[in-house]
């Protein structure tokens, strides 16, 4: 009897997880015209699981690049890096567009919660020494004329190489750790400041106690 109850409970949990996966619109490509977000299907509870799943997926993709036994090349390193993190990019694009244009208290709270998580994830990519070495190797190949890239390919390589440099990939371990701390703190402070500004703007009221000051306005505005 206990075994039956345990089996049924396990099945219920698995079904719930499967249903949650199937109903989260961020877990698959948007099936709308032009790939526009399914705003009518997106709910506040979808964002955090999508952020975490997106981070998990990109970590696995980065790991595959780093652990590749192939010689670093444009396709297996730069293109693979550029193609990583599709789920994360999808949820970030929608979430931050809405927090800028149509936010609410729940969205603001989530943005403060997820900011340091995303900051850490970004540092884990651009301070990853093994990944940086592969990107730098491809960049060096082009500098030495060992590979020929199109204008678009060169632009992509240059973008990622400079992103690693500017993100501190060339710093020693101690400075990188300090940079991680600063980035994490800045990510939280930036969101907190933005939310404070928004709250102040929303709380603003203009009191007009002299009707003459409304001269020139249409009647329907008055």
Predicted regions and their residues:
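Bacterial Sec-dependent N-terminal signal peptides
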Residues: 1-22
């Amino acid at each position: 009897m206990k075994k039956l109850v345990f089996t049924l409970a396990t099945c219920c949990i698995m079904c719930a997880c499967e249903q949650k996966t199937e109903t989260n619109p961020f877990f698959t490509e948007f099936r709308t015209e032009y790939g526009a977000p399914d705003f009518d299907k997106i709910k506040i509870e979808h964002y955090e699981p999508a952020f975490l799943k997106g981070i998990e997926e990109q970590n696995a993709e980065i790991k595959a690049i780093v652990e590749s036994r192939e010689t670093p090349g444009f396709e297996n390193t730069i293109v693979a890096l550029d193609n990583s993190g599709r789920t994360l990019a999808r949820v970030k694009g929608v979430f931050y567009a809405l927090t800028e244009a149509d936010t609410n208290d729940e969205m603001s709270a989530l943005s403060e919660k997820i900011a340091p998580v995303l900051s850490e994830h970004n540092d884990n990519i651009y301070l990853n020494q093994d990944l940086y070495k592969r990107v730098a190797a491809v960049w060096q190949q082009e500098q030495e004329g060992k590979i020929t890239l199109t204008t678009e390919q060169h632009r992509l390589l240059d973008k990622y190489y400079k992103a690693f440099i500017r993100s501190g990939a060339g710093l020693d371990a101690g400075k990188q750790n300090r940079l991680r701390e600063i980035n994490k703190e800045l990510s939280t402070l930036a969101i907190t400041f933005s939310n404070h500004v928004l709250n102040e703007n929303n709380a603003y009221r203009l009191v007009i106690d002299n009707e003459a000051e409304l001269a020139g306005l249409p009647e329907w505005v008055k």
